[in-house]
Amino acid sequence: PGEHAELAYFKANGFEIEKRAQVLGTLTRAHKGLCVAGTHGKTTTSSMAAHILHQSHVDCNAFLGGITKNYGTNYILSPKSDYVVIEADEFDRSFHWLTPYASVITATDPDHLDIYGTKEAYLESFRKYTSLIRPGGFLVLHEGLEMQPDVQEGVTTYSYSRGHGDFHAENIRIGDGEIYFDLISPLGHIKDVQLGVPVSINIENGIAAMALAQISGVTPEEIKRGMASFRGVDRRFDFRLKDDKAVFLTDYAHHPAEIRQSVISIRELYRGKKIAAIFQPHLYTRTRDFYKEFAESLSLLDEVILTDIYPARETPI
């Protein structure tokens, strides 16, 4: 807030003040930015990519949107690596400050309509973001996005999804609490990839993270080791209790599409089990704009407890 004592001090004493997004933009101009944008999946995918790179010979810096369980922090610093992994946030058009070397776009389901107003404006913002990727860089798009990219000359564009695209999975094996699959990639196939956090939604997240790792020169064995040793992110499909009687997890699924994917992943993992959820809507405007979609997604559950809306930055409407 503008009246914050420390902020007021720096303003009064003539210090240059920049938003976090501006600082991240400076980092992407000084280093090779590996950025993950999209309505959902950003935090897990960028955290996966950061872990794969950090434990490899390539290494990386990283500025993430959640606390990674491998490191207990949302940032990683490396004095030797020229790569920086960044979670590219579309809220307030923050990702327009970035100049990525390579970027994944996970999804473009409309969100933040309090900022954008319309679905068309939201998609146009992502289109502009793709134009910021530097020449000679890379764009990895999820299959089936409505948004059409506008990349500069010399940018290589790939597609990905669980079962289709330039990067995809084959020979998926789910059982006994583990998930294995083969990565099919234009940069070299990798067999028997193991998910460190074995939920099916992480197959796609992992494919995107491995694409960035391959683009950055991480070896196949380093990629497999990083995927298997990734421990997840706080509040992203985060198991808090798991025994013979019950499983309890917390997940920051605050968009209807995210809720749907989370429920599908849980049902695939625990077939035939009852699923009950406590759901706290996030933001008045998001709840207003997508109440029908929320109702449809929550209907996939067996039992739902609704709490009051969490306002975050908003006042009641």
Language model features by range: what are they?
Residues E18-G25, F63-G65, E143, G154-G175, ...:
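Beta-strand->loop->alpha-helix junctions that form or flank phosphate-binding loops
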Residues F138-E143, A276-F279, L300-P311:
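Short internal beta-strands
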Residues P1-E143, M147-T156, I207, A213-S216, ...:
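Phosphate-binding loop of NTP-binding sites
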Residues V36-S46, I172-L183, V193:
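A polyampholytic, Gly/Pro-enriched intrinsically disordered region
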Residues G175-G177, P186-E303:
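Nucleotide phosphate-binding/pyrophosphate-handling subdomain across enzymes
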Residues V84, F167, H189-V193:
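Short beta-strand segments
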